[in-house]
Amino acid sequence: MKKWAFVSDFDGTISKKDFYWMVIDKYFSEGKELFKDWKAGKIKDIDFLATVFQSIHQEEAHIIEEIHTIPIDEYVPHFIKNVQENGGDFYILSAGTDYYIHHILKKYDIKNVTVFSNEGFFHEKNIHMRIDQNDWKYSERYGIDKSKVIQKLKEEYELVFFAGDSEPDSHPAVFADLTFAKDALQDMLEEKGVPYISVEEFTEIEEYLINKGLISR
């Protein structure tokens, strides 16, 4: 088995703003009501995101420019490099879409990172998702079952760390060896009795991994 892997959610964990909020704020004001319906459990996560992502109505070059404005935790590129240089593999696990994630990785010249997410593509001025119901990690609610991904990685690595911030992350956190939780995820894991380390940024995560001897200074 390989020694260790670090798996991170993207929106709200690596990035400081969810991509869907950027779309709603700039191009789809009706999405604010849809957001309420989603949070009330009236629509599934994947249906909410599909509707938002198909409401941009912009040329692809402009969409990519907008994606590049998404703020991220500035330390993340350095953190990923440190994980990789210390024998770890870094993965991104997102219930959004890999379309904007790959553009962010390219912007920051982040390499050798596997992205597990819903497949996204540009078509007729919007972002669409290609959901395969026969895929091993398919979820009817999220498009991707994050728990299945963590469980599969646990078969390959001695240690699997996870970082997340919101409800979809509460499920894979159960299976990770240790979860670093931001924002709303902290209370959710508290309620479920799932152990976690409370963090706000990746410098704190790195400090923990240094103290555990996984990353050298």
Question: What annotation goes with each model-predicted range?
Answer:
Residues I46-H78, N86-G88:
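Metal-dependent phosphoesterase signature
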Residues Y75-D89, G96-R217:
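C-terminal cap/substrate-recognition subdomain and adjoining C-terminal extension
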